[in-house]
């Protein structure tokens, strides 16, 4: 593909033969250290999934959820399309509209799942069955619908619990949307209940705070929550980016090895400095839910509605 000189374009556009218009948008020179100016946005799988979510790099493959269809898929290098990995993924028995959402891998290489249908955090056992890890909160009542999660270096699991995936036939038992910690001994503690619609979650590089993607329709944003209890702080406000051409809100997020924040937002993936400066975007052409790094740490996988995308990055993802 031949690109026009940089002074003619601030947006480098890659046209797919079919599907959404995709591009890399550079807003700050600092983006050059993170993403090549000619980085390609590849559609590596375009399947029958309705809302792809929660990708994780697991045993040499990327796995991700199709939330409404209660299925998790896997994609391995060389596959023409992702194949079914878990069905059901969000319940012990098959049921519609209650699939898994966020996926993660613990320090022992085991797959963890936020399960909407079962309203819990679980682990995939070696026998292919789900092992419940957290089914009730610190007050002894059921969670709303655990949404996304991350794993600390000490093995603790942090997760968000809005009501997005709460089965319609069931009622919330908590009057708030919590962010929780699940310790290795099984104890659940509330980190904060002060955020409405907490969604994506990641630990800071020093493990002292959480970054949270807040899916508030009127005020989508990225916030931090100090784990010492010193409070919350907004890092980036995304409402001004919303438009007909830029669908989606703040949903999933990850940090790279330098502490930059890669969060889904209006238009696709927003790339922010640790201080919250918007450096650029990966524009996916449609609403985009989540992302993760895989392979050697320089490959970013993005779940974008009915598509799984891939972009090579200069910087590695945190943890690689």
For the regions a language model picked out, list residue spans one by one.
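Sequence-structural signature of mature extracellular/luminal beta-sheet repeat domains
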Residues: 17-320
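Bacterial N-terminal signal peptides
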Residues: 2-14
């Amino acid at each position: 593909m031949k690109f026009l000189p940089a002074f003619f374009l601030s947006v480098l556009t890659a046209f797919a033969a079919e599907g959404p218009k995709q591009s890399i948008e550079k807003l700050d020179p600092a983006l050059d250290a993170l993403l090549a100016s000619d980085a390609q946005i590849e559609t590596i799988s375009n399947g029958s999934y309705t809302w792809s979510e929660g990708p994780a790099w697991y045993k040499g493959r990327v796995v991700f959820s199709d939330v409404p269809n209660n299925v998790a898929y896997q994609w391995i290098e060389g596959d023409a399309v992702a194949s079914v990995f878990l069905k059901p993924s969000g319940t012990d028995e098959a049921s519609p509209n209650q699939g898994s959402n966020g996926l993660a891998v613990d320090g022992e290489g085991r797959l963890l799942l936020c399960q909407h249908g079962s309203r819990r955090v679980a682990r995939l056992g070696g026998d292919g069955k789900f092992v419940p890890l957290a089914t009730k909160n610190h007050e002894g009542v059921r969670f709303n619908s655990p949404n996304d999660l991350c794993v600390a270096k000490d093995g603790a699991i942090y997760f968000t619990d809005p009501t997005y995936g709460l089965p319609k036939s069931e009622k919330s038992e908590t009057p708030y949307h919590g962010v929780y910690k699940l310790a290795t001994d099984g104890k659940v503690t509330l980190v904060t209940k002060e955020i409405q619609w907490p969604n994506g979650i990641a630990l800071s590089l020093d493990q002292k705070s959480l970054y949270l993607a807040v899916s508030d329709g009127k005020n989508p944003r990225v916030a931090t929550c100090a784990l010492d209890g010193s409070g919350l702080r907004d890092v980036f406000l995304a409402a001004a980016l919303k438009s007909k051409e830029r669908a989606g809100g703040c949903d999933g997020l990850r940090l790279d090895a330098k502490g930059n924040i890669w969060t889904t937002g209006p238009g696709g993936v927003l790339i922010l400095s640790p201080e919250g400066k918007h450096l650029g975007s990966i524009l996916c052409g449609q609403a985009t839910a989540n992302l993760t790094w895989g392979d050697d740490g320089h490959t970013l996988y993005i779940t974008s509605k009915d598509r799984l995308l891939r972009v090579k990055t200069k910087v590695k993802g945190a943890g690689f």
